[in-house]
Amino acid sequence: MGNSDPFLTYLKSFGYSVVRLPRIDIRPLQVLVREDTRLTRLGNLETILHPGPQVALPRMTENIAAANISGERTRDLSLGVGLSILGSVIGAMGGSQMGLDVSYQRAKTVAFEFSDVLEDRVDLADIDQYLTNADIAAFSSHAAKLLEADSIYVTTSTIKSRKFIVQASETSGSPIEVKLPEIQKLVGAKVKVAAAGKSNSKIAYEGEQPLVFGFQAARLFYEQGRYTAFKPMEPGAGAFEARQAAADYLVTDSPFVRLDIP
């Protein structure tokens, strides 16, 4: 059964899982490992699985215009979920989220629109060929055990943007207008706040750097020290979730899975 948490699944229709606290340092070809209920970022793929003599590390294609996501709108989310997402975005931009609930106090629902979305990706077919020829690093004895336990995942695609557009609506479904100067003062100078339409009902929040807000990953399967298969992670089945400064978490539809990022 899939996860029904609207926070975890609001990108599912676009084929991505959610980064609860958007970051700049999530990218393809990063290795995640699952131990019991914890997923920890282990390092880069080539550090754990050295390139073989015939197939080099796959080339990552960066900053591809994600036309299937740019300009698209999420479904209406509850005010609490929407403000939680918006707060995490503003926080990642270096702004303050204190007082946002007051600015949107008349709202019942919130929807997001993604602008100028860029994708970084590596084709799974290339990763498949690389892994078939790669060798487990000689000094990665623990990683070898984790591979045999099918506990390793690799990120394959990330989506990022500098600008996130928000539209809030009241119970009747009518958009509500907010006070731009008031919100700009609340969030601070690091976040640019501007109307994204003819009225102040659709607001664009823009930061200085593109933030990764969605990702795709694949689980790797090994047998007797050799790679055998991969399985793409189902969109919406997990999400990066920041719980404290030094740790992130991956939430799944089964027990909570913690993702620590050094």
Give the residues covered by each predicted segment.
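Membrane pore-forming effector domains from diverse proteins
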Residues: G2, R20-P28, V33-R38, V55-A65, ...
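N-terminal segment immediately downstream of the Sec signal-peptide cleavage site
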Residues: Y10-V19, I26
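Glycine-rich, hydrophobic membrane-spanning regions of integral membrane proteins that mediate transport
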Residues: L45, H50-A92
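Extended beta-sheet lipid-handling architectures
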Residues: D76, G95-Q97, T171-G173
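Residues on the lipid-exposed face of transmembrane beta-strands in outer-membrane beta-barrel proteins
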Residues: L79-G87, S174-E182, A195
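Outer-envelope beta-barrel architecture signal
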Residues: G94-M98, K185-A189
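Compositionally biased, low-complexity segments of secreted and virulence-associated proteins
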Residues: R106, E170-V187
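Short acidic DE-rich linear segments
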Residues: R258-P262
